[in-house]
Amino acid sequence: MPTPKRQLGDRGEQVAAVYLERCGYTIIARNWRCRNGEIDMVARDGDYLVFVEVRTRRDEYALESLLMHKRQRLVTLAYHYLAEHDVPETTPWRIDVIALTVVGNRLVVTDHVMAAIGEEGCA
């Protein structure tokens, strides 16, 4: 049985997926894994391939919980995904972060930061 923290994270990813679809994104993959870790979601936003990190917290510090080592690992994971899926080098991509916070009994998207992790991946 998943821990309460894992259950909250799973709920957050479900809410984030619905949010992205309502914003016009197409979800390509969820919980994509390789030996280096996991990407919560891979989506399309127009011409962009978007790697999405979902941060779900019970307090208002969801975005602040994304530490530097995790940011660096997300960039590494994005490169692994691009290579494994033979994505053309000309394909523009970015890493977005979606923050959700528990408000009462609901999960609320509090932030959606596009290209949140530097310019490393933008073609």
Swiss-Prot record:
Q: Name one Pfam family in it.
A: UPF0102
Signal peptide coordinates: none
GO terms, molecular function:
nucleic acid binding
In terms of CDD domains, this protein maps to: PoNe_Nuclease
Q: Check the record and name the NCBIfam families matching this protein.
A: PRK12497.1-3, PRK12497.3-3, PRK14678.1, YraN family protein
Q: Which family does it belong to?
A: Belongs to the UPF0102 family.
Protein name, UniProt field: UPF0102 protein Cagg_0930
Q: What is the lineage of its organism?
A: Bacteria, Bacillati, Chloroflexota, Chloroflexia, Chloroflexales
